[in-house]
Amino acid sequence: MEKLLLIGINTRSMLKSALKLDYEVFSTSYFSTSDTPAIKNQKIILEEKDNESSGVFEDNFDSASILDISRDYIDEVDYIIPISGISPNDFTKKDRKKILGNKNTSNIENKFKFYKKIKDEFKVPETFLIKDVDEAIEISENKSDVKYIVKPLKGSGGYNINLLNDDSYIQLNDGEKFILQEYVEGINLSSSVLGSDNYKKTIMNSRLLTEHDFKKNNSYIYIGNILPLTKESILTEIKDIDKINNEMIETSQNLAYTFDLIGSNGVDYILNENGLYVIEINPRIQGTFECIEKSLQINMLDAHIKSCLNENVDIPKAKYYAYKKIIYSPCRNKYSKIDLDNIYDLPHLGTITEKSEPLLTIIDKNSNFDKLYKKVENSAKIVNNEAKKYQQDAI
């Protein structure tokens, strides 16, 4: 039996799909959720303990640590699938040969290289590579009619993105590179693309959700997705949803050919009155993974592997709407059991989650969009209320 390693921030959803396939499965992850399947070959960095804090993800996560504890697994397995938090470029050239997926993503993960490669062919926000905040301010002052955001040269999930304005104070860390990008206000959308050597095809469009969608603040942290993309799930009054879907399908496939994307990948967009802007490519299995599985009723990991091995994959039509919503803790709280049938990525009982850290994920499906939306939003209210019941004093 061939051996498969899943490696990344959280492997729970992929593990469940992998265990249905004919592989000996290995897993290395940062998070240890209580609903993560326990397997023989498994390593987890974050040890959640009763009455102890799980800390702050941004302060504690380091991709190098996951790679370090995975060395023996990497040597032993036949295949590797990097998930979020790990780049193919983090591996040695020898180990990259084992990766099922894109093996070199430098022109994608480097947002300025990505911009330069596609700016003449695709609609993109104007982007600059900056040395410091002073340079960013100088550029913005020369174009006073344009709003800008500052974001890391590399990174995903919407972290460390700041709107540049007169009231903001932005501190750039020494040694870290940033870009200044034209701020495009609009509707966040996403495509999931499957690629092999012989084909590239868009399998699903979705409404991408950030904290800004719900709180109307300047936080762009990823919260979830709703799919498939329809006039209901886009959550905005839109005239021609079919035209938008077709443009996303075509643009995503063209981008997949431009970068020769292999396996499952995501393309993020912003739509406004000026058109559809390409924001970035996520060159790996993305956050829509479970939603697509629920909507299409397929094993998405199997589809990813088959496309990487150049096998044909039949993609059925969507059977359900699916909605994923990550709940970030409303306060510092001690986790207690919540009686809901649609919550995942659960903390261990008695462990402490810091305020604004990911608490759990709500994922559900229904053929009726309104029923699905109401159920997920109701579950979100229950989770937030339960978290507040077990609020802990700040350190």
What do the predicted segments below correspond to?
Residues 253-290, 327, 334-335:
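Conserved metal-phosphate-binding beta-hairpin within the catalytic cores
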Residues 185-189, 193-259, 282-308, 317:
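ATP-dependent carboxylate/phosphate-activation module, predominantly the ATP-grasp catalytic core
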Residues 5, 302-395:
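Peripheral (often C-terminal) accessory segments that flank ATP-dependent C-N-forming ligase machineries
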Residues 97-167:
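A conserved helix-loop-beta module that forms one wall/lid of the active-site cleft
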Residues 165, 195-200, 271-274, 309, ...:
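Short acidic-glycine loop/turn motifs at beta-strand connectors
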Residues 118, 140-163, 176-191, 203-207, ...:
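ATP-grasp fold ATP-binding core
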Residues 1-109, 113, 134, 377-378, ...:
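ATP-binding N-terminal substructure of ATP-dependent carboxylate-amine bond-forming enzymes
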Residues 25-26, 124-125, 178, 323:
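Hydrophobic anchor at the start of a short beta-strand
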